[in-house]
Amino acid sequence: MTSVPDYEQSYVDRGRDRIGLRIHPEPAGAPRAPVVLLWPAMGVRASYYTPFAAALRAVGFAVVVADLRGTGASTPAPTRASRYGYAELAGDVGAVLGHLKSRIDGRTRLLVGHSLGGQAALLHVALDGGEQVDGVVLVAVGLPYWRVYPGRAGYGVLAGTQLISGCARLLGRWPGWGFGGRQAPGVVRDWAYTARTGRFPRRGGIDAEAAIRTVRTPVLAISVDHDRYAPGETLDYLCGKLTAAPVRRERYTVAESGTRLDHFTWVRSSAPVAARIAAFAAELPAR
């Protein structure tokens, strides 16, 4: 017997690519609920965030989870012909907001990003001006600049990111060997650039670093205990670029969760994170 999915699958066309969206049911008893648009980590499917979506719905949010380009329901898979990088991922955020316009008009809307998804969300606000967004939430996000990692970990980050970028350049894509899933060469190129330089890449004549400094949208930034990919130092470094935005910096601890945490497993015990996001949203001005 085939089970009926508890979400509506939708798609947004982006040239040769399309973005898959999981639109979860509206929370019970909350008409015109605030909306969370969730952007995943590199190579992580939207389906992985089902427990987090449930936790967000339980505290009163309408939830839409996107698949990043080339992952999950977003097709096609990356190939040598894929021509997108960070700038296009940021553009996808705006395209999805436009696609959802009839659903979200007049409602508070938050971009919630995990890892690469958080960078894409923040870049969208920086490059688009942020008029469509009331708040940004970064969970287990950082800029992976090798110099800010604790101890000697940064040397491994520098070597690993540049090796992966080199392989992607030679092969025409990153096959996902042990990390990040299959990725377009441009995504890996831009990711490796941030790790090497501590800066967002300049693409199409647009200075993303300067744009980030103009962001005024409120930001909730939550680091997660035992996150070796985005330790708190990398989130602090990223938040340091948000010189014009009100930033609330928090930490999700093992003591609070009552279970093991890392860059990925926090999703399975995310009710406390959802509660923090609800408190943050309650303080935002109504539309």
Over which residues does each language-model region extend?
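Conserved alpha/beta-hydrolase
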Residues: A46-Y48, A53-P78
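Short beta-strand/loop motif that positions the catalytic acidic residue
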Residues: V215, A221-S223
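Catalytic active-site module of serine/aspartate enzymes centered on a nucleophile-bearing elbow/loop
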Residues: E250-R287
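N-terminal cap/lid segment of alpha/beta-hydrolase-fold proteins
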Residues: M1-P25
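Conserved acidic catalytic loop of the alpha/beta-hydrolase fold
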Residues: A90-R107
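Alpha/beta-hydrolase-fold enzymes
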Residues: V112-R199
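Active-site glycine-rich loops that stabilize anionic/oxyanionic intermediates
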Residues: A41-V44
